[in-house]
């Protein structure tokens, strides 16, 4: 019997780490399309990433369907990560959470600036005319 963690145990760590960081870790099942990544990660601020899980030491085959999907998703601007150990799973969740926080902060600042610029309590439309 081996002490190496199985892909399922890495998947459990990823799911828990993503949820702990405030994201969703959805199992991606796509009938009729073999080789799609195992998980889709969603974080506030529009952060979407895909994850192909492998047991430790295993890699995505260069000419396989999983690699084709990784390239195809990248063409659409979606990152696809390969995770094959528990540390990578935890680090990916932390990195995506940090990016989510950064985007939300930028959006909040942009909205504050927009409201400030758009707040004209006395402007040309508010002036009385001498008609």
Positions of the model-derived regions?
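Catalytic phosphate/metal-binding cores of nucleic-acid and nucleotide-processing enzymes, i.e., regions
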Residues: 1-131
């Amino acid at each position: 019997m081996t002490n190496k963690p199985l892909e399922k145990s890495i998947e459990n760590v990823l799911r828990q780490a993503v949820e702990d960081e405030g994201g969703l870790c959805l199992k991606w099942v796509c009938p009729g399309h073999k080789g799609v990544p195992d998980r889709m990660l969603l974080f506030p601020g529009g952060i979407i990433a895909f994850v192909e899980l492998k047991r430790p030491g295993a890699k995505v085959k260069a000419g396989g369907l999983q690699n084709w999907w990784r390239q195809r998703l990248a063409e659409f601007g979606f990152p696809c990560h390969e995770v094959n150990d528990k540390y990578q799973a935890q680090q990916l969740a932390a990195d995506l959470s940090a990016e989510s926080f950064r985007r939300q902060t930028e959006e909040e600042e942009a909205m504050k600036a927009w409201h400030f610029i758009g707040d004209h309590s006395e402007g040309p439309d508010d002036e009385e005319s001498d008609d």
